[in-house]
């Protein structure tokens, strides 16, 4: 497992753990990001991490992206549609 902030552009990952407070968790859930969600990293350079999930692109601040622990979808995920 590693933080979403360390994922490479184009990589598909599965959310395994979220180390965020209640407010941040609610915000992530409202955006469709949960434990088990499959994400594709669109952009990960300076500034927010841009991900795609369930047909939507979402910007996540680097601080929050450090609290979202992920795993490579090829090795440890479900076959959920992006």
UniProtKB/Swiss-Prot annotation:
Domain of life, per lineage: Archaea
Keywords: Ion transport, Iron, Iron transport, Transport
Keyword Lipoprotein among UniProt keywords: no
Pfam families in alphabetical order: FeoA (PF04023)
Gene Ontology molecular function terms on file: transition metal ion binding
Protein's UniProt keywords contain Ion transport: yes
GO biological process: iron ion transport
Family matches, as PANTHER family: FE(2+) TRANSPORT PROTEIN A-RELATED (PTHR43151:SF2), FEOA FAMILY PROTEIN (PTHR43151)
Function comment: Might be involved in Fe(2+) ion uptake.
Protein family: Belongs to the FeoA family.
Name listed for the protein in its UniProt record: Putative Fe(2+) transport protein A
Record organism: Methanocaldococcus jannaschii (strain ATCC 43067 / DSM 2661 / JAL-1 / JCM 10045 / NBRC 100440) (Methanococcus jannaschii)
């Amino acid at each position: 497992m590693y933080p979403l902030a360390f994922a490479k552009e184009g990589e598909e990952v599965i959310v395994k753990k979220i180390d965020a407070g209640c407010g941040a968790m609610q915000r992530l859930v409202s955006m469709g990001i949960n434990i088990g969600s499959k994400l594709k990293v669109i952009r990960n350079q300076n500034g927010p991490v841009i991900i795609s999930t369930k047909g939507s692109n979402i910007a996540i601040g680097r601080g929050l992206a450090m609290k979202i622990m992920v795993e490579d979808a090829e090795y440890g995920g479900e076959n959920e549609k992006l």
